[in-house]
């Protein structure tokens, strides 16, 4: 069966708002400029929407060789290729990650906007963060995504969920990279190796969801949905699944 790509997204800075794009350069580590940056605290620990839902109100845009971040009335810019020389060692969950700070001015801006000290850091080289996938029994070169380089969701999966919810939600809750048009809910779970254009992809594993999907990206208000409803029909092995993680071969 042929599937149509409906939407493409990148999330340049981990846990900040995403960008809808018409096209994207696919790489082994994920789409170009997708989750290549992240915020860390004074102990070099990852900062996410799980603890700071207000991160959803920071909106990045890539304009030529610059990244522009808007947060309400405040705007900050930095060069995409900009970074300091000194390496910083952090973690993305259980994975050691070698990153570098973008610049001091950008870190100060984020610290001021968030109200606590933090740094914006960037992963530079392939191999600076590796993820050991027990599911695939292999080590993956990944950017700063949670575990896998791409997230695929079928349109009917969201349509089915919205039929069960009192208030409909958008696909942005689930932060996919690729949204395809489907006719059967969650049929993407059962893909093996498949092709989009000239690119071959492999299904890695269904995506287990956390409380972050309960954060409304338009308002930064956290509720019990949609995780509460999803848990009634998408739970397996104590995880709630929505969408599937994929690799570009």
Label the predicted regions.
Residues 1-249:
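Metal-cofactor-dependent catalytic cores
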């Amino acid at each position: 069966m042929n599937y149509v790509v409906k939407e493409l997204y990148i999330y340049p800075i981990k846990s900040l708002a995403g960008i809808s794009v018409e096209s994207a350069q696919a790489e082994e580590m994920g789409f170009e400029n997708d989750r290549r940056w992240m915020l860390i605290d004074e102990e070099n620990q990852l900062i996410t929407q799980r603890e700071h839902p207000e991160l959803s109100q920071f909106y990045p845009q890539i304009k030529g060789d610059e990244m522009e971040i808007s947060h309400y009335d405040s705007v900050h810019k930095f060069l995409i290729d900009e970074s300091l020389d000194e390496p910083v060692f952090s973690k993305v969950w259980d994975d050691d990650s070698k990153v570098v700070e973008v610049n001091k001015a950008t870190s100060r801006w984020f610290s001021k906007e968030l109200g606590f000290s933090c740094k914006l850091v960037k992963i530079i080289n392939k191999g600076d963060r590796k993820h050991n996938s027990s599911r695939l029994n292999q080590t993956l070169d990944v950017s700063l995504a949670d575990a896998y380089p791409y997230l695929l969701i079928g349109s009917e999966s969201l349509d089915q969920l919205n039929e069960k919810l009192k208030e409909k939600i958008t696909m942005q809750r689930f932060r996919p990279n690729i949204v395809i048009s489907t006719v059967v809910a969650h049929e993407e779970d059962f893909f093996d190796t498949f092709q989009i254009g000239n690119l071959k992809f492999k299904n890695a594993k269904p995506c287990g969801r956390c409380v972050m999907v309960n954060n409304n990206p338009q308002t930064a208000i956290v509720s019990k949905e949609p995780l509460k409803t999803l848990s009634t029909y998408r739970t397996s092995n104590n995880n709630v699944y929505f969408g599937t993680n994929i690799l570009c071969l």
